[in-house]
Amino acid sequence: MALKTLQALIFLGLFAASCLAQAPAPAPITFLPPVESPSPVVTPTAEPPAPVASPPIPANEPTPVPTTPPTVSPPTTSPTTSPVASPPKPYALAPGPSGPTPAPAPAPRADGPVADSALTNKAFLVSTVIAGALYAVLA
């Protein structure tokens, strides 16, 4: 009986793995920048007076080179007409003389499959458990 139980657990594991493989990918996680907290209030402490410093000695700095303003070049002339590509042709069928015009296909739903469809992951998992239990009992 232990062999049948082990087989049933392997069976359930394979079906659970396939169920998880069919699950939609998770939405990407966006990290928000950390909120900067205000710095704590620093209580002033009594500090000894700073010693009197002598004035700094001026260094001989080179004089900056005068810059000339940029010159404005006259605008270049471009051709008066530029080649324009024609819009692409649709891939739909052209209406025939005796046939009806094809109707546009409905747009796919943006939110994915219907939530209460018959083959959701929960239903698949429950049916897998039932099949595994039947396999363990009857096999």
Swiss-Prot record:
The modification Pyrrolidone carboxylic acid is found at residue 22. O-glycosylated on the hydroxyproline residues. It is found in: Cell membrane. Residues 117-139 form a propeptide. A lipid is attached at residue 116 (GPI-anchor amidated aspartate). Residues 1-21 form the signal peptide. Residues 30-115 are annotated as: Disordered. Keywords: Cell membrane, Glycoprotein, GPI-anchor, Lipoprotein, Membrane, Proteoglycan, Pyrrolidone carboxylic acid, Signal. It is a lipid-anchor; GPI-anchor. Expressed at a low level in roots. GO terms for cellular component: plasma membrane; side of membrane. Residues 46-77, 97-107 have a biased composition (Pro residues). PANTHER family: CLASSICAL ARABINOGALACTAN PROTEIN 3, CLASSICAL ARABINOGALACTAN PROTEIN 9. Belongs to the classical AGP family. Proteoglycan that seems to be implicated in diverse developmental roles such as differentiation, cell-cell recognition, embryogenesis and programmed cell death. This is Classical arabinogalactan protein 3. The gene is AGP3.
